Amino acid sequence: MIIGIGSDLCDIRRVERTLERFGERFIQRVFTETERRRAARRPAQFAATLAKRFAAKEACAKALGTGFRRGVFMSDLGVVNLPSGQPTLALTGGAAERLAALTPPGRSAFVHLSLTDEYPYAYAHVIIEARDGA
């Protein structure tokens, strides 16, 4: 059962300008340690890597039905990879609480994430699925 869908399109050039203006302050405030490490390993695509993750956070906040309010913050959402390499999102804090509230009793939530970029755009699509079994 699908319990949430969200998508977001991010302009990589906007992330580049934000990095020029705010640098490390922006990176520390918005991205998790895992996301920062992944972007650092891709210096030629640094801004695009961050833009995809930014779009993923926005898409997930939409799928949760809250946006970034009601206790859901950018720092509560982090792009991680499953052992297969498939991207997903790890939710903490208010985002995890909202996900738990959305998930019907006796079901477990799974966050599907698709990421892509083609300069100057980065795109993310999130589907939150409630699966049988907790």
Curated annotation (Swiss-Prot):
Keyword annotations of the record: Cytoplasm, Fatty acid biosynthesis, Fatty acid metabolism, Lipid biosynthesis, Lipid metabolism, Magnesium, Metal-binding, Transferase
Subcellular location: Cytoplasm
Cofactors named for this entry: Mg(2+)
HAMAP family reported in the protein's UniProt record: AcpS
EC number: 2.7.8.7
Cellular component GO terms, alphabetical: cytoplasm
NCBIfam families named in the record: acpS, pantethn_trn
Role summary: Transfers the 4'-phosphopantetheine moiety from coenzyme A to a Ser of acyl-carrier-protein.
Gene name of the record: acpS
Catalyzed reactions per annotation: apo-[ACP] + CoA = holo-[ACP] + adenosine 3',5'-bisphosphate + H(+)
TM stretches of this protein: none
SUPFAM superfamilies tied to this protein: 4'-phosphopantetheinyl transferase (SSF56214)
Name of the protein this chain belongs to: Holo-[acyl-carrier-protein] synthase
One annotated GO biological process: fatty acid biosynthetic process
